[in-house]
């Protein structure tokens, strides 16, 4: 089903790209936009995950420089019956996390240094289980491609003014009004697609994540802490790349941005309530042979991500 959704997404984004191209340059602009969109679709399938990780300057870690964090992800992946994903950390004081990759065999999970500092090991396990659920549900391909194409469409809408703003442009059938429409409609349409994709999948990932880690309350507690942190601690890389907001477990954009006029995520309180109800009903075990992860409590130092000094890397809580 997700393959069908991904194909529909690519078709919609391509059509939107062509529409903006038509508004800017008529039929010639539409054909150029089609060729660009086709190339971007191909490129996004193979490289969008690396682009997102690069945008946040995420550093890959392993059992040597992040032993406890890596072990949590490894145990959760085993519980879920998934191949071990690549594990990344990115340097940000805001607690948050995301997953990416075109399939479970080529997937990655990334957490911020702020997440490891602010959350307990159990809460980190809940968050990583949620991200692994996205991988298992094959949400990551659609979410990552959406981030790449939405960013490109928003940028195209901004460029429309400069390349199509000439009132005397004979190639532009709708003139200056058409350019204004492109500037407004393109980013808005991309935002609406992000909303539709993210909101319908977060509840499913919450539920499956609770099953993977074995305790819905771990994730519920983590969501509350992350939401409070995201509301007060900015993520500068996310502010520069708002098209990736729907990939995170909690919207990383500050409340002052107009991007939050249409939220990319369900209400956090509703998500927490659903997890608490799941715990109260005893529905914390999946149909498969899942055992609860039991993270070892240690101090919360985090590995060096290569951006803040030359101290030797250490594992979280080590």
Swiss-Prot record:
One of its GO terms (biological process) is proteolysis. Pfam families: Peptidase_M48 (PF01435). Its cofactor is Zn(2+). Zn(2+) binds at residues 130, 134, 202. Disulfide bonds: none annotated. InterPro entries: HtpX_protease (IPR050083), Pept_M48_protease_HtpX (IPR022919), Peptidase_M48 (IPR001915). The chain crosses the membrane at residues 6-26, 28-48, 145-165, 173-193. It comes from the Bacteria. Keywords: Cell inner membrane, Cell membrane, Hydrolase, Membrane, Metal-binding, Metalloprotease, Protease, Transmembrane, Transmembrane helix, Zinc. The keyword Hydrolase applies. It is a multi-pass membrane protein. The active site is at 131. Binds 1 zinc ion per subunit. Its EC number is 3.4.24.-. GO terms for molecular function: metalloendopeptidase activity; zinc ion binding. Gene3D superfamilies: Metalloproteases ('zincins'), catalytic domain (3.30.2010.10). Its main location: membrane. It is found in: Cell inner membrane. Residues 284-318 are annotated as: Disordered. GO terms for cellular component: plasma membrane. Belongs to the peptidase M48B family. This is Protease HtpX homolog. It comes from Rhizobium etli (strain CIAT 652). The lineage of its organism: Bacteria, Pseudomonadati, Pseudomonadota, Alphaproteobacteria, Hyphomicrobiales.
